[in-house]
Amino acid sequence: GVKATLDHCTDGELISDELAKEGLPVFVGPTLGSKSKAELRHKSFTTPGALYHAGLTVSIITDAPVIPLEKLPMCAGLAANAGLPMEEAWRAITINPARSLGIDSRVGSLEPGKDADLVLWTADPLTTIGAEAYCTIVDGKVVYQAE
């Protein structure tokens, strides 16, 4: 069968009880930016936390290139600041989207046999706006190293 997800879900907080009955994984975003369309008028960084507390598997998205991908950690941090537990904020940008898309056997967490992709930061990128990547590893090989 078809494995469905609910994408964008920017105002899903308003119907979190109904969404919980369906149990579909939700992808929330883009939340950063203006409320330029009618369907965005209720968007808020409280939505990921509300959906998580309703029992849903939450992923956070930027809808890149609408909001640049490098803003993803900041979006997760803002969701944590608005009620999503910090550990769940990390899951919302790592293992949750991988599981929801059925690719968690390869990516989403650091485990033997999975792709060895990793970014090392100067500080926690979810809580520190000035955090910078100082080392990036792809397939187990260093592809970027800050000077």
PLM segments and residue spans:
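Short, solvent-exposed mixed-charge patches
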Residues: 146-147
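Catalytic beta/alpha-barrel core
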Residues: 3-12, 31, 35-37
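His/Asp/Glu-enriched, well-ordered alpha-helical/loop segment
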Residues: 17-25, 29-33, 37-123, 127
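Short aromatic-centered micro-motifs
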Residues: 136
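Short, small/polar residue-rich loop motifs at catalytic or cofactor-binding pockets
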Residues: 129-131
